Amino acid sequence: MFLIVGLGNPGSKYDNTRHNIGFEVIDNISNEYNIDINRQKFRGVYGEGFIANNKVILLKPTTYMNLSGDSVREVANFYKISNENIIVIYDDISLDIGRLRIREKGSAGGHNGIKSIIANLSTDVFPRIKVGVGQPNIDLVNYVLGKFSKEEKEVLKESIEVATNSVEEIIKQDVNSAMNKFNGFKANKSI
């Protein structure tokens, strides 16, 4: 069983913000694999289904970004999911819009949602898919909570699709296979 977590902040005022790209990827996975995310528990909204004949749980924590680890820990403990089978998808300001980076472990890199997950799982060994949202030219908080432009949304459509494919590759093969296949991905469209 795999737990696939998209990081973001709950509430419509955060829709289409850079910090919520993880939620957008989860929504895309939900549509692609017909997995309804309609249950509330574990301080999040989630749904169960299958990807590549493996049972998966799609989770969007509703704790706000900085406490995401609370929700992840509750689901992982309840379903007895090992860290290696927890895939976390989130925004990365160090990557240009339209780029992806997959890692099997590592530090939080200044991302508070990842910092919370590492603290709650007591490990930094879990796969993650970083979706580039670009470098801020304004205050960091205003940037990550800011909305994407129409042009940025067009570029991100491709990134979201490839992030979805990356999740399937991790499940079917492993993290290294996904890294070899998708690391360095850059959307064909540019801004």
From Swiss-Prot:
Disulfide bonds: none annotated. It comes from the Bacteria. The active site is at 19 (proton acceptor). Its EC number is 3.1.1.29. InterPro entries: Pept_tRNA_hydro, Pept_tRNA_hydro_CS, Pept_tRNA_hydro_sf. TRNA binds at residues 14, 64, 66, 112. The record marks 9 as: Discriminates between blocked and unblocked aminoacyl-tRNA. One of its GO terms (cellular component) is cytoplasm. It catalyses: an N-acyl-L-alpha-aminoacyl-tRNA + H2O = an N-acyl-L-amino acid + a tRNA + H(+). It holds the Pfam family Pept_tRNA_hydro. One of its GO terms (biological process) is protein quality control for misfolded or incompletely synthesized proteins. It is found in: Cytoplasm. CDD domains: PTH. SUPFAM superfamilies: Peptidyl-tRNA hydrolase-like. Hydrolyzes ribosome-free peptidyl-tRNAs (with 1 or more amino acids incorporated), which drop off the ribosome during protein synthesis, or as a result of ribosome stalling. Monomer. PANTHER family: PEPTIDYL-TRNA HYDROLASE (PTHR17224:SF1). This is Peptidyl-tRNA hydrolase. The gene is pth.
